[in-house]
Design a protein with these regions (language model features):
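Low-complexity, Ser/Thr/Pro/Gly-enriched N-terminal "stalk/linker" regions
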Residues: 1-43, 64-65, 69, 78-83
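Solvent-exposed loop and edge beta-strand segments that line ligand/cofactor-binding
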Residues: 30-49, 56-57, 94-113
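Hydrophobic core/packing positions within alpha-helical solenoid repeats
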Residues: 48, 52-55, 120, 140
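Helix-terminus loop motifs that line ligand-binding clefts
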Residues: 60-127, 132-134, 141, 145-157
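Charge-dense, low-complexity intrinsically disordered segments
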Residues: 1-4, 57, 134
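Bulky hydrophobic/aromatic packing residues
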Residues: 25, 36-40, 44-46, 115-118, ...
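Residues at structural and domain junctions
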Residues: 26, 37-38, 52, 102, ...
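Hydrophobic alpha-helical segments
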Residues: 7, 49-51, 60, 116
């Protein structure tokens, strides 16, 4: 498969799986790519990071929107959830059977590997967008401080 066909296929999948809207549970705007239309219908932390990296090559504005949406789910203590259920009503059967660690809110209380800074850095290097960087730094700082405080109690890194 040549590069052009590969890019075309990737673009088609990412556009087909793109979800945009306003969450009825918190009024926030969202724009992200679902990993799978059936199996994984919500925003998943590390999938969004990888989607954003891929989107750098296809649609840089959507790459930024993907990370902004994920960062907008950060809690006041800095935690960014593993899954954010932006469209709660769309998959009630998924929510009733497949979520471990689901809180009363519309996100999971578990986490995935903390690769968000890498994705944000890749976007910034590709775009040079200072406003995006200025928005991301405090969110990322709070998130990594949360990890240090909550997930590393013995302080061994």
């Amino acid at each position: 498969m040549d590069r052009k066909a590969l890019e075309s296929g990737a673009r088609q999948i990412l556009l087909t799986n793109l979800r945009k809207g306003v969450a009825d549970w918190n009024g926030k705007t969202f724009s992200f790519v679902v990993p799978s239309l059936r199996g994984y219908p919500f925003q998943w932390f590390w999938d969004s990071c990888f989607h954003a990296i891929a989107l750098i090559h296809l649609d840089r504005e959507q790459a930024k929107a993907e990370m902004k949406t994920l960062m907008s789910a950060a809690l006041p203590d800095g935690f960014i959830p593993h899954i954010v259920f932006w469209e709660m009503g769309k998959q009630p059967e998924f929510l009733s059977h497949n979520i471990v660690g689901r809180t009363a809110e519309c996100y999971s209380s578990t986490m995935q590997p903390p690769i968000i800074a890498y994705a944000v850095e890749r976007i910034y290097r590709a775009t040079g967008d200072e406003e995006f960087r200025r928005h991301a730094i405090p969110v990322l700082t709070a998130y990594y401080r949360w990890l240090e405080r909550v997930r590393d109690p013995d302080e061994d890194g």
